[in-house]
Structures are given as C-alpha cells and as structure tokens.
C-alpha cells in the first residue's frame, strides 16, 4: 500500500551533535565482523571518532581495546563510550576530564551534556555540516526538529545564525542556560535534564532485575533535582527531562509535583522517552499537564535487548495503547513523537508503530503523523510504501520542498 503524509517535525533529535558526527565513521549498519575489521584498519597516528557502536552486537573486551588503533567508540544510544588504550593519550590532550573519568559509568551518566560537548568538539561543527545534515533529513521525511541538547554556546550560535534557524527548536542543559546572555536565552525553548541512563548502556533506572550486568543510575539525588526545578521555575522557560525507567519517571513526577505546588512555573513540561511509564504515573503526568515526548522507533528495544531485559520489561516498553486509550493522551497535543536520531527519518518509526513486537505498542499511521506534527519553516509531502507482508515501511519519495517565507 502507498500513502502520502506531510513532511514532518521530529520532536526529539540531537541535530548539532549528529551534524558534527557526519564526518565520523558510523558502524551502526555494519555487521559485527565488518565493523571490527574497519576499526582495526583505522589510522595509528590520530584519534578516530566512531559512532553507532551497538554493545549488544559488538561487545568490547579490555583485550580488544588494547589491540585497536586510537579510537573513541560512541554507543548508538549516545549513553556510554569506550576508548582504546592507544586513544587515551589523544583524549587526555583534548578533553582531560572525560579521559580521566571514562571508566566511571556513574560519572558519565551524570555528565551527559558536557560529554556531548566533548563529542562535538572532537568531531567539529560548522554551518556546512549543519546544513548538509538537515538537508539529508528531507528525503527521509523530516523537515524540522527539536534540538534537545545544544552542546555548547558555539553550537547554538552556529544553528541560530544559519538559514535553518526557523526549522529548529533549541533546548539546553541548565548549566549552559545560566551561562547565556539574555538574547541567547530568548532563543531556547527550555532547559533539558537527564535523569537516568539508557537501556543500551544498561543504566536506565528500571527496578529490574536485569539479565546480566545492569544498574539503575540516577543523575541527581532527589533533593538536588528539586533544587534545580525550584531555580529553573523562575527562568520563565520550558522544562524537559529525559526519564526512561519507571524509577526515573517516579523521581521526575515527585519533584515536579512539589516544585509546582511551591510556585515553580514552566512554559511547558515535557518528559522524554518514558518507555516504562505505568498507568498510575501516566495519570499523574496527565493531571500535571505534562507532555510525553516519546520515540516509536524505540519499540524495537523489545526485540534488540532480549540479552538484558526480562520478558515483562520487553512487553512494558512503549505502552502507547494504555497511554492513549486508558489515560487519554492525545498524539499532537500532549503526546509528541521523535526519533532521537536512532535512526533518522520516519520510515523506521512507522515500521515500529504499525508492526510492533506487542499489540500494546501499536500506533495507527494517523496517530504517528499527529504525534510528529507537520514540519516548521518548510513544507512538502512524503510518500510511504507500507508492506504488510514484509512488515516494513519505507519512504519512496518526497514532493518538491517549499521553504516558508
């Protein structure tokens, strides 16, 4: 079946970071043996930044890292990285704190924004890379995006001074927001917090148990998070919080309830990912007027992570039918969808929405399109091929794109 949808807005991406990564090697689509052969053939005289590493496909032992050329290998989830032994001296000269703390997973999960800044600095970002990345999204069905963690002030300046500014909404970490002048603060939609890790790095704040290694990791103690919300509630801006596991979701809701009761005010409040939200938490979020910003493409975690998640967690992932049918969240109003760039485009998200691992994860195409919303600053149409036999959706074409005046 072929159908046409509008060019869409991705409500959760990391545009400047992925633009910087465009000059880096990407092994996300490589078979493990091919990826390892590629890594072994990289230059010995400089540090190679490699993205798209999937630890469940290509585990990295200390012996393997000791034999590789100078590389930093960044997890596909963006949470977690490893550095080869020969790469450590290169990292020490450029980002010494990241180098010294590289093996401390708790520190890494608590410092995602500065690590993103380090990645951006290592890979390099300029207007050309930014434009090329955003243009590459058009044939994939995406015309605009929320940039969910602008890594540096310099990156904000590159984005906001580009012709693509009207197609981007900016979110920044609290520490970066406080460094900004009034003019730059006026450019951003709000502050973005990270409350837990990720399934890909075995650090999402789920109660568990995990299969094999895994630990619920929190960025903030409860009192520290509440203090941040109290302070941020006077900024007059929006609030977004990454919370994957049910324990992180609970921490977020409890802190927001107290902060709002005490007078904190935000233009909007978003919880990102919320893959393991339960019905009671969903009702509390609804009562607070919170927007759930979710990733239909993460439905495939229920297939990809059978090595670390129990059957109950595989099934609980992305409970869209409960959220929509039981609690009353409405795609496009208080439920938004985005890709997190994992992968880019609408095809994979549509595949997971229409052909999920569990019926509780299913979204209709109308719900998916509403949750993404139409592109900002640009318009066009996207032709989708929906193959019910192969259970796959692909983009077969896009119309001529028209830029907004």
Regions found by a protein language model. Name each.
Residues 1-164, 170-175, 200-248, 310, ...:
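Divalent metal-binding segments
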Residues 9-11, 145-146, 166-172, 189-195, ...:
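Hydrophobic faces of well-ordered beta-strands that scaffold small-molecule active sites
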Residues 14, 186-203, 290-300, 339:
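Non-cysteine beta-strand/loop elements that form the S-adenosyl-L-methionine
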Residues 57-59, 280, 345:
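Residues that form or flank phosphate/diphosphate-binding pockets in enzymes
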Residues 69, 164-166, 184-186, 265-267, ...:
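A short helix-to-beta-strand connector/capping loop
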Residues 81-84, 177-181, 302-307, 347:
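Short, charged, surface-exposed secondary-structure boundary motifs
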Residues 158-192, 277-287:
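Extended hydrophobic/aromatic segments used for targeting, binding, or gating
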Residues 230-240, 247-249, 253-269, 274, ...:
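His/Asp/Glu-enriched, well-ordered alpha-helical/loop segment
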């Amino acid at each position: 079946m072929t159908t046409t949808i509008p060019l869409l807005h991705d409500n959760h991406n990391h545009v400047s970071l992925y633009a910087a990564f465009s000059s880096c090697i990407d092994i996300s689509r490589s078979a493990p043996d091919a990826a390892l052969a590629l890594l072994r053939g990289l230059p010995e005289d400089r540090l190679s930044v490699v993205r798209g590493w999937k630890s469940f496909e290509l585990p990295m032992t200390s012996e393997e890292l000791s034999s590789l050329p100078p590389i930093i290998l960044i997890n596909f989830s963006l949470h977690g990285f490893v550095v080869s032994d020969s790469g450590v001296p290169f990292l020490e000269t450029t980002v010494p704190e990241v180098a010294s703390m590289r093996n401390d997973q708790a520190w890494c999960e608590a410092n995602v924004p500065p690590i993103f800044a380090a990645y951006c600095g290592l890979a390099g970002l300029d207007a050309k890379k930014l434009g090329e990345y955003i243009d590459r999204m058009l044939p994939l069905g995406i015309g605009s995006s929320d940039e969910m963690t602008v890594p540096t002030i310099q990156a904000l300046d590159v984005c906001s001074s580009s012709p693509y500014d009207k197609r981007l909404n900016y979110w920044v970490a609290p520490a970066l927001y406080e460094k900004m002048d009034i003019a730059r603060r006026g450019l951003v939609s709000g502050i973005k917090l990270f409350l837990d890790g990720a399934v890909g790095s075995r650090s999402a704040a789920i109660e568990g148990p995990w299969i094999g290694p895994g630990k619920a990791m929190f960025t903030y103690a409860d009192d520290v998070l509440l203090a941040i919300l109290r302070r941020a509630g006077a900024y007059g801006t929006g609030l977004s919080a990454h919370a994957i596991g049910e324990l992180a979701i609970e921490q977020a809701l409890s802190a927001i309830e107290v902060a709002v009761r005490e007078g904190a005010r935000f233009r909007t409040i978003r919880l990102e990912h919320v893959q393991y939200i339960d019905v009671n938490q969903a009702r509390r979020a609804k009562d607070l007027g919170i927007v759930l910003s979710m990733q239909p493409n993460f439905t495939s975690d229920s297939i990809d992570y059978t090595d670390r998640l129990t059957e109950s967690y595989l099934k609980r992932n992305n409970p869209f039918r409960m959220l929509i049918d039981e609690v009353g969240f409405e795609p496009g109003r208080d439920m938004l969808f985005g890709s997190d760039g994992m992968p880019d485009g609408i095809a994979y998200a549509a595949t997971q929405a229409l052909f999920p691992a569990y019926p509780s994860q299913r979204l209709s195409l109308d719900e998916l399109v509403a949750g993404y919303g139409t592109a900002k600053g640009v318009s066009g149409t996207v032709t989708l091929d929906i193959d019910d036999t192969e259970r796959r959706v692909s983009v077969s074409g896009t119309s001529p794109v028209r830029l907004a005046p």
